[in-house]
């Protein structure tokens, strides 16, 4: 997805993350620039490399690499107290880039599937057949109270919460501890991911590899 950078992904020269009018661009002059309506952000690395690329490492840090050097041109945040794992940088509706992680929950990895876009942030909810969607995949909070991950057709179920018929007018919410829960209209909890992290901001990303993954808490943001 063009608004998400995951650990192991690479943004090449003159490519970008984008969300509506905002863009996070790895420019040809080796400068990383966030163009938005709130002052933006830049790495101030123009002229310090050639054919530069942007990566997100397994400590939740952004790295700029030059084709003519084995040492990163730029690493940010410079000092982090994070564990190794899988992180996610998202360009969100606030027009800022925020790094979340490490991943604390996911649907099972699908086998032999190609490696499209949507995210749910802490405190946001999904209900009445609302969904996160990618090229081939959809994560749908169905009106029968079942949370379902499908590929292609609505009947091709990759994963489900198994809560069909267990409540009425159910909604799914991502909490500020990274826990996903499904609740009915009487506020009875019918499903919980049982993945409680430290208090903070989390994000659920439906990735293009067919996994829905919760990352967090947020470890850095251009809004800081």
Swiss-Prot record:
Protein name stated in the entry: Mannose-specific lectin 3
Domain of life: Eukaryota
Species assigned in the record: Crocus vernus (Dutch crocus)
Matching PROSITE patterns: BULB_LECTIN
The keyword Disulfide bond is assigned to this record: yes
MF (Gene Ontology): D-mannose binding
General remark: On the 2D-gel the determined pI of this protein is: 5.18, its MW is: 48 kDa.
InterPro entries: Bulb-type_lectin_dom (IPR001480), Bulb-type_lectin_dom_sf (IPR036426)
Function in brief: Mannose-specific lectin. Has weak agglutinating activity towards trypsin-treated erythrocytes from rabbit but not from human.
Subunit and interaction comment: Heterotetramer of 2 domain 1 and 2 domain 2 chains arranged as a dimer of domain 1/domain 2 heterodimers.
Entry keywords, A to Z: Disulfide bond, Hemagglutinin, Lectin, Mannose-binding, Repeat
Disulfide bonds, paired cysteine numbers: 30-52, 145-170
